[in-house]
Curated annotation (Swiss-Prot):
The lineage of its organism: Bacteria, Pseudomonadati, Pseudomonadota, Alphaproteobacteria, Rickettsiales. It comes from Anaplasma marginale (strain St. Maries). Homodimer. InterPro entries: FAD/NAD-bd_sf, FAD/NAD-binding_dom, Fd--NADP_Rdtase_type_2, Ferredoxin-NADP_redctase_2. Its EC number is 1.18.1.2. It catalyses: 2 reduced [2Fe-2S]-[ferredoxin] + NADP(+) + H(+) = 2 oxidized [2Fe-2S]-[ferredoxin] + NADPH. Belongs to the ferredoxin--NADP reductase type 2 family. It comes from the Bacteria. This is Ferredoxin--NADP reductase. FAD binds at residues 28, 36, 41, 81, 115, 282, 323.
Amino acid sequence: MAIIGAGPVGLFTVFQAGMLGMSACVIDALSEVGGQCAVLYPEKPIYDIPAYPVTLARDLVNNLKRQADPFKPTYLLGHTAEQVLEEGEHFVVVTDKKVGVRCRAIVIAAGSGGFGPNRPPLDGITEYEDKSVFYHVSDVSRFRGKRVVIAGGGDSAADWAVSLSEVADSVHVIHRRHSFRCAPNTLRNLESLAERGQIKLLVPYQLAGLAGSDGMLNGVIIRNISSKEETRIDADFLLPFFGISAKLGPIANWGLGVESFYIPIDQSTCRTARTRIYAVGDVAHYQGKLKLILVGFSESALACHDIYKVLFPETPLNFQYSTSKKMPC
């Protein structure tokens, strides 16, 4: 099978396919496996993976790849899946580099599709990017003893404010609203740290400007939403967390009935509108869908079992728990 997307759910799909004796080729536009977890949030703690009270996104990706490795998947990294051609009982997935992957089934595990950060409209911000302005955290030690300004009101902003308060000299959180859109437990931690003076919450404010030279910040200008009064905060780093700009790209033109960047699927099988093309993870949608990694893992299992039944109708699949099967050496 061809798996479109090498994020956590795509990697787990390799494992599920391998456990059923099916081989996989994984196609991803990024140069490394892991998707957003590897590129945007490698040091972000994840708390809702069963049996792991907490794991870093980077470690989750590494473990999923190790779990898939015994099945010897082929990885086409740095390739964008552009076309799907039908040749009898086979598909040929053609990439932007004109490489064709011949397969009998396709599993789309594309997450949010291609992505990039939503950049705040500040003059000269590109001069500071990757030097003192970052849209994701790849190395927590960079911020040790530094003055950090975080902008945003969602999970990423709140999570990193809590985490960086343990290492930074100061953490200011800028949000244009009084309420935050993050997990209740994270919000409680954020408010508790603010009450103890370990984090300073500045609401309702928005970013207004940057101060510094040669790509290195020494201050961030913020503006009060109500009074329009501007204030300068001494800062070494700015972390704007305004979400990502995502698009499905060519997948949207594959005749899958895409709705608002999501692919409708049959919840029980993960089948799409096209025979032998499946979708799992965040890109897949049905009524009541929860966008959680563990839900994507479940969908991978459902899809792979259905694919086996479709491809090998004469070979009954006798369900076995993983402990009853032997892993390849």
